[in-house]
Structures are given as structure tokens and as C-alpha cells.
């Protein structure tokens, strides 16, 4: 299965997201250029954004995710109509821009670390978040006493997501993880998925066996102390990473796809900045 790898610093300076924000914008522009021949042409009388205006629009979408700003507020600050910004975000989400870019960055990171393109094992977990009344779904998590939604995540040993699913918070982990397993199977993954004791039951075991994925639950600690076994702590760190993005603390999204898109944008921000620093360290060395 391998061991967890922690190449990045955890000091406050390493979380200065605005310091390397140009890396995020450059990565998104590169992916837009790569998708130029596959995406449908824009309809309407207005010409599409280009140049500095396009960079400003991408930065505005990132600010909505990182700062938790409202669409109308960011539209006033960047002098771009909020309807234009939201339409760009929704359109790029439908085209799968964020997922494609995230997959490319994960592959680049694994290659930079000298690892294989595909993981041999994954770690799964979930996190309950409070949601607004206008959110796409609300459920009450009796264990954590949270009314909102639940994020189901499958990550590799570096903590980067391979599959993401969201559901109301009242859905049990053993049921909410099944769509994640289908996403993993769609990527061609067949192996072991590590998780906590919530991922038990014959129905979940049969679903995993049908997809070629063996789910291995393990205890999360002893004597009331939370200490994940093995490399299970990696997914806990991933959930802590995205908690720094304010749009993902209280959920306002009206569609599941938009929430998943913001989760992907958060990891794109983390990965693109780390890749830039990794290249800088190699050059300076």
C-alpha cells in the first residue's frame, strides 16, 4: 500500500494562498487552452473574456471559494458583472474543467514524487458541514449534531482526491460512499480502500466486491482518543485542508455539482501552489 508522504511544510507561511495565486490562475488558463478544441463555442452577442479580463474572472472565482464571498460582492470588486462570473463558473463546471485540471495536477505531483500514475490503495472518509436553508440538501447528523450536508472523499496517500461525492448529512457513511466507489471503479482502480468502522456491512461489502474494491475498516483510536491507524490520517489532513476555504465551511450551493466544483477548486489551489514551490526548490538546489 505504501506509506504516507508529507513533502510540504505546515507552517503558516505555507498557507499564504495569495502569495502563489498566479500559479492557480496560470494552471486554469493552461487547461482552458487545452480544452479549446473540445468545448462548444460560446453563443451570444458579447465576445468572450480574454487576456487580463479572463485572468481577473478566474481570480474572482477563486476568491469566491477561498474567501467565501458572495457572487454579487465579488462582481462589484472586480468590475465584472456577477452574472458573467457565475455563468463562467457554471459553464466550466458542466464542461468538467475543474475535474480535468485536478486529475492533471495529481498526475504531475505523483510523477514529481517518483510514484506510479495510479495509486495502489486509497483512503476514504466523510465530513459533515452546516448548510444554509437554500442549499440543495439538508439532513441532521445525529453523531456530530450538525444539520447540513456530508462530503464523502477518497484520497491517495498524498491526500489528493480521487473521487468526491456529497449528500445530506443524515445519510450513513456506508451508503454515501457507494457513489465514491463507482467513481474509483470508473478510474480503473481495483484494490484496497481504507476507512473507519462506519464502512461496514454486507451491502457495502457486496458493492465493493462487485467493483473489485476491498473495503478495509479499522478502529479510529482506543480509550476515547482519536488516533487513525496506518495512513488513515492522510484523509483527515485533506479534510482539514479544505476547511481553510470559507466557501466549504457553511454550504450555500444549490446544486451538488457546484459544491463538488468548489471542492475541486480548493484542491487545485493547493496542488498548483505546491507544484510551483517544488519546481522552485529544484531550481535553487
Regions found by a protein language model. Give the residues of each.
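Short alpha-helical elements
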Residues: 1-285
Amino acid at each position: 500500500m505504501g506509506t504516507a508522504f508529507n513533502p510540504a511544510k505546515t507552517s503558516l507561511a505555507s498557507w499564504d494562498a495569495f502569495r502563489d495565486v498566479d500559479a492557480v490562475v496560470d494552471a486554469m488558463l493552461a487547461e482552458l487552452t487545452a480544452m479549446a478544441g473540445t468545448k462548444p463555442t460560446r453563443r451570444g452577442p458579447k465576445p468572450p473574456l480574454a487576456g487580463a479580463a479572463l485572468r481577473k474572472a478566474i481570480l474572482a472565482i477563486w476568491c469566491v471559494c477561498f474567501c467565501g464571498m458572495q457572487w454579487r460582492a465579488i462582481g462589484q470588486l472586480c468590475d465584472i458583472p456577477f452574472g458573467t462570473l457565475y455563468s463562467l463558473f457554471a459553464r466550466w463546471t458542466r464542461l468538467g474543467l475543474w475535474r480535468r485540471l485536478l486529475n492533471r495536477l495529481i498526475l504531475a505531483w505523483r510523477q514529481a514524487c517518483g510514484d506510479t500514475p495510479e495509486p495502489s490503495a486509497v483512503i476514504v472518509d466523510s465530513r459533515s458541514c452546516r448548510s444554509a436553508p437554500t442549499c440543495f440538501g439538508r439532513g441532521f447528523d445525529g453523531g456530530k449534531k450538525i444539520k447540513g450536508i456530508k462530503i464523502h472523499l477518497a484520497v491517495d496517500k498524498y491526500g489528493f482526491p480521487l473521487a468526491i461525492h456529497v449528500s445530506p448529512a443524515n445519510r450513513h457513511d456506508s451508503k454515501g460512499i457507494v457513489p465514491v466507489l463507482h467513481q474509483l471503479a470508473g478510474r480503473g482502480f481495483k484494490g484496497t480502500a481504507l476507512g473507519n468502522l462506519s464502512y461496514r456491512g454486507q451491502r457495502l461489502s457486496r458493492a465493493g466486491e462487485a467493483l473489485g474494491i476491498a473495503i478495509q475498516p479499522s478502529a479510529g483510536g482506543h480509550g476515547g482518543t482519536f488516533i487513525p491507524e496506518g495512513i488513515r490520517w492522510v484523509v483527515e489532513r485533506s479534510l482539514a485542508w479544505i476547511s481553510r476555504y470559507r466557501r466549504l465551511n457553511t454550504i450555500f450551493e444549490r446544486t451538488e455539482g457546484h459544491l463538488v466544483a468548489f471542492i475541486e477548486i480548493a484542491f487545485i489551489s493547493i496542488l498548483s501552489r505546491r507544484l510551483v514551490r517544488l519546481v522552485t526548490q529544484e531550481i535553487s538546489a
